Amino acid sequence: MEWVRGETIGFGTFSTVSTATKSRNSGDFPALIAVKSTDAYGAASLSNEKSVLDSLGDCPEIIRCYGEDSTVENGEEMHNLLLEYASRGSLASYMKKLGGEGLPESTVRRHTGSVLRGLRHIHAKGFAHCDIKLANILLFNDGSVKIADFGLAMRVDGDLTALRKSVEIRGTPLYMAPECVNDNEYGSAADVWALGCAVVEMFSGKTAWSVKEGSHFMSLLIRIGVGDELPKIPEMLSEEGKDFLSKCFVKDPAKRWTAEMLLNHSFVTIDLEDDHRENFVVKVKDEDKVLMSPKCPFEFDDWDSFTLDSNPSFDSPVERLGSLVSGSIPDWSVGGSWLTVR
């Protein structure tokens, strides 16, 4: 498979995303694609993403992978993942251009349904995405969206959960479910919680959790994992939307609705005759160029995805969280933005 690298359109901690065009007679894939490239430091994450995408197969709501390749650039071996190109970038990039405004509820309903169909496919194949957020939902010219960035995705057990033996924080704090913080439990239910956070953000233009500038991200994890506090549901959202989110924001993952169940909820099944993709597309000016996810982490105002490992195990969430906020961990307050650490 031969291709020619184009301009750089985004950066991750260990990876760079570029456009690319195919050479003549180089296989059956689009003329314009996206290439995620990394050196040896990010090879494991890229390899995991390729393996997961291969296992998932084709799904209209999941970004397509056309293969992988290795190149030598400036004397260094690069690992490349050839992906479907999303011309409008991520929903996070798009909403940033709206200046804090949310999307129309009809658009939120449609995007939510698309992500749910993607999650249903992911979960049915025995995987959890582990990092659902607006930055990992890509937008196309026709207004459709697809789930992307499977670098943190993992295969789960038969009950659709996976338990890590080490003390690990995995994903993006603002989207983490209580069981991820308390029990190292990652699975389909955690993806549903994260989707609820994404729905709040799409509708309101604000994150589901309010955090003060300069606060330690571990203080947010304590709010998520300890006590009864839940993400705030927007007051202006319809009753169907509020009820939908109440099914996502259930502390007990066993009682949280599944993607399959939520696809039958009236919030996404309601028939809106005037809801056409064209109505959404015209809101984006042709000259507006948005970055494809993953974009430069220094452009995020919120904490980005990462993994943080420790060794001991603890008997209670309070003990575990206490260890995580100890003095051994630097105070990475929100003075800037967060890097993806995988």
UniProtKB/Swiss-Prot annotation:
Modified sites of kind Phosphotyrosine: 41, 66
GO BP terms in the entry: abscisic acid-activated signaling pathway; cell division; pollen sperm cell differentiation; protein autophosphorylation; protein phosphorylation; regulation of root meristem growth; regulation of stomatal closure; regulation of unidimensional cell growth
Active-site residue numbers: 131 (proton acceptor)
Post-translational modification Phosphothreonine, affected residues: 19
EC number: 2.7.11.25
Reaction(s) catalysed (UniProt annotation): L-seryl-[protein] + ATP = O-phospho-L-seryl-[protein] + ADP + H(+); L-threonyl-[protein] + ATP = O-phospho-L-threonyl-[protein] + ADP + H(+)
Stored Pfam families: Pkinase
Broad class of enzyme this protein falls into: transferase
Tissue specificity remark: Expressed in roots, seedlings, leaves, flower buds, flowers and siliques.
Compartments, record wording: Nucleus; Cytoplasm
Signals that turn on the gene: Induced by salt (NaCl), mannitol, methyl viologen (MV), sorbitol and cold. Triggered by abscisic acid (ABA).
Region span, Required for MKK3 binding: 285-342
GO cellular component: cytoplasm; nucleus
Regulation of activity: Activated through serine, threonine and tyrosine phosphorylation, especially upon abscisic acid (ABA) treatment. Restricted activity by ABI1-mediated dephosphorylation.
Positions of post-translational Phosphoserine modification: 18, 93, 114
Keyword DNA repair: no
One Gene Ontology molecular-function label: protein serine kinase activity
Record keywords: Abscisic acid signaling pathway, ATP-binding, Cytoplasm, Kinase, Nucleotide-binding, Nucleus, Phosphoprotein, Serine/threonine-protein kinase, Stress response, Transferase
Family statement: Belongs to the protein kinase superfamily. Ser/Thr protein kinase family.
PANTHER family in UniProt: CCR4-NOT TRANSCRIPTIONAL COMPLEX SUBUNIT CAF120-RELATED, MITOGEN-ACTIVATED PROTEIN KINASE KINASE KINASE 19-RELATED
Subunit structure: Interacts with MKK3 and MPK18 via its C-terminal domain. Binds to MKK5.
The protein's name: Mitogen-activated protein kinase kinase kinase 20
Lineage: Eukaryota, Viridiplantae, Streptophyta, Embryophyta, Tracheophyta
